[in-house]
Amino acid sequence: MRDKIKNKEYFESIITQKKENISFYLNALKNNRVAIDRKYVVLNSMAGDCLTSLIAKYSAGYPIEDLYTDYYDALEYMHQSWMVLDNRAYLKDTKYNHYFGSDYDLMLWMLSLGYLLDVEKQKYMLLLEILDRFSVKDLLYETIIKAKISERLPITEESYKMIMDMPWAYESLRHAVKETDDEYGKERSSALIEQFLNKEFYQRHKGFSFYDHHHKSNNNIYYGYWSFESAAIADILFVDISPFENNKYFPKDMYFYKK
């Protein structure tokens, strides 16, 4: 067990539930029981179920090797749905070239997990196709992508507008990637990642995404609180992780997996 909030039985029930959901949806799609205008919404739900299953397995203590199938399935369903659905943030009639809330987190986790698991480059490129199709340019996204896809051209500016707590929820982590690439910059980056984990990762998600899910377990929506983006950024920046290695949100086993 890696999670300290719920027990193994709880997570196994989540994993079983998600497996049954995906099987049901696949059967419905195969037998044309999903309306055309609902197909991509269903695929989007399947992507979320696969990612939830992956994180629940990590929380339950599964070997990292057992997470790849869920990742690749989530990636495929996400690509099929997000290339059609427009999940960008909007207010009234205005669309913004960035994501908000759960959609922002989902993309960030998929990018981070793909880096940490060192998934196939060709498969990872599917995430870039989504971002580029909708002109989404984000500092954290691109920092992780560049570490995985070296030929990726750097962005000159980000595409978002400061609305709906993005990128405020990731403020210290964003500052960490802007530090200078020297001994002192790495020390500051390490301190900023520690601050993010201690004071921002969970607290600044209040009101949206995964916040407080462990108190809503009757709905089986809690799957663990893990900052995969912190592990990816810490590895990319080559910082000392000892100050936050045992933080409850830091996925230590995932960080060390490919070391």
List the predicted regions and their residue ranges:
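Alpha-helical oligomerization segments
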Residues: 182-259
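Eukaryote-skewed repeat-based solenoidal scaffolds used as protein-protein interaction platforms
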Residues: 2-212, 222
